[in-house]
Design a protein with these regions (language model features):
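Conserved motor-coupling elements within RecA-like helicase/translocase cores
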Residues: 320-349
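Accessory interdomain/linker segments of ATP-dependent helicases and helicase-like nucleic-acid enzymes
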Residues: 2-143
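Conserved helicase motor core of SF1/SF2 NTP-dependent helicases
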Residues: 279-282, 290, 340, 354-356, ...
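Pre-ATPase regulatory/linker segments immediately N-terminal to the P-loop/RecA-like helicase/translocase core
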Residues: 2-33, 47, 120-249, 299, ...
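Conserved RecA-like ASCE P-loop NTPase motor core of nucleic-acid helicases/translocases
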Residues: 260, 267, 272-302, 309-312
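Pre-Walker A (Motif I) flank of P-loop NTPase domains
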Residues: 250-256, 281-282
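Conserved helicase motor
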Residues: 311-319, 352-358
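Hydrophobic beta-strand scaffold positions of dinucleotide-using enzymes
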Residues: 260, 350-352, 374
Length: 412
């Protein structure tokens, strides 16, 4: 697919100029912004530009398939909301139907809503999880649920129980009338889709073109990662000492690969973290593909007594670790300077790669000496390239990367 390259490669700021408008606005504001945006594309090396356009086309196609679906996978894509029948969506676990709301109080704003499952529905077939974004809509009893025939509320799954399910509305309602009006109707829940996750991938690819040439050459495998054989361990990790030393001597990049259940997280991640914390004034980012893996990392940190801040949504984190969320910890800060101090003094940050990708401003406040990425073999390059290319003050925001993954595992 060369359409994107044919469009973007010759594109100039003047070609994007509106026919009407202030000359001063154009010359002093709009033109400089557009030229700064396009410059990394025009100034990139042929290899970097080819890499950029190849993955730009890949992400574009992935976004398209997320909307219209894949012919090889039945019921995929957001278009399944109106293309697939309710029975098909129930069979694939992509719909809750015949849900009845527990009516909230008549007065006051409605931020959460709880709905009961039908008695006959087999919930074990569902592929919904806490933290998933969903749509919620009513439909008349005796008819098939159809999101295109009624109003739709957007929400996030807060909790999934054995008899009921709780949602947090993305746009809280002013009162309960919207639910009491449909009290004789059933309600259905289906998966939602946000484009913001793809926006972060596009932003990350552009960050790759803006990265220092030395980091670009490393990511494109144009040079060997640097190693410092003079570095020695400060801690003792028993049988892990040999591997821990090799990881420490790697200056920029290390791959830790092994079969499932071999202790890559329990020993590899934890001991690498503990060794890095023995160095003064170092800061570490711990990432994984799924929130479940991040919960596991948080459990290891809690067991070791290591303080950390977690990036992400409270609904995606296990209840035991929500008190460590950045959004929770800042509630104790009375001033903006206290928030900055909290971020600067906390040495360990934890979150999914998606959460870190969604917070590019964090790297302007916080630079990391080490990033350890668990479940790395489940990730595709566009999920990582923005993180590995992030810069602050002209230098990589992450100095060293350790990727941990299962042997011969395909991306999720």
């Amino acid at each position: 697919r060369g359409e994107l390259r044919e469009t973007l490669e010759p594109l100039t700021a003047d070609a994007l100029r509106a026919r009407s408008g202030s000359e001063k606005l154009w010359e002093q504001y709009q033109r400089p912004q557009l030229e700064a945006l396009l410059h990394p594309i025009h100034a990139a090396t042929p290899l970097a530009r080819a890499y950029y356009f190849r993955f730009l086309s890949f992400v574009e196609l992935e976004q398209l398939l997320a909307k219209i679906g894949n012919a090889a996978k039945e019921g995929s894509g957001f278009a399944a909301k109106w293309q697939a029948s309710a029975e098909e969506k129930m069979q694939t676990g992509d719909m809750y139907a015949e849900m009845t709301p527990i009516l909230p109080a008549a007065e006051g704003p409605i931020e959460t809503i709880t709905l009961r499952y039908p008695a006959h529905e087999a919930q074990e077939l569902s592929n919904f999880r806490p933290g998933d974004i969903v749509i919620l809509y009513p439909y008349p009893k005796g008819q098939e649920p159809n999101a295109t025939r009624t109003m739709v509320l957007r929400a996030t799954i807060a909790e999934i129980g054995t008899a009921q399910l709780s949602l947090t509305l993305r746009n809280p309602q002013g009162d309960a009338r919207i639910f009491t009006y449909y009290k004789e109707a059933y309600w259905a829940i289906e998966h939602d889709l946000f484009d913001s996750s793809f926006t972060a991938l596009y932003r990350g690819l552009h960050a790759f073109l803006s990265a220092p040439a030395d980091r670009q050459s490393l990511l494109l495998l144009q040079r060997t990662p640097r190693v410092n054989l003079q570095r020695q361990l400060k801690g003792d990790y028993g049988d892990f000492n040999e591997l821990a030393l090799r990881i420490k001597q790697a200056e920029e990049l290390f791959l830790l690969i092994g079969p499932p259940g071999t202790g890559k997280t329990s020993y590899g991640l934890v001991n690498t973290l503990k060794e890095e914390l023995l160095e003064p004034d170092t800061h570490i980012a711990l990432m994984a593909y799924t929130n479940r893996a991040v919960d596991e990392i948080c459990s290891k940190l809690t067991a070791e007594g290591i303080d950390y801040l977690r990036i992400g949504s409270s609904l995606s984190a296990a209840p035991a670790y929500r008190k460590q969320l950045l959004q929770t910890r800042v509630n104790d800060c009375g001033k903006l300077t206290e928030v900055r101090t909290l971020i600067e003094r906390t040495r360990v940050f934890v979150g999914t790669t998606t959460a870190f990708n969604a917070q590019p401003a964090l790297f302007q406040l916080k630079q990391f000496d080490l990033a350890i990425i668990d479940e790395a073999s489940q990730l595709l390059e566009p999920h990582l390239i923005g993180l590995l290319s992030a810069c602050a003050n002209g230098k990589p925001a992450i100095r060293k990367i350790v990727l941990i993954g299962d042997h011969k595992q395909l991306p999720a």
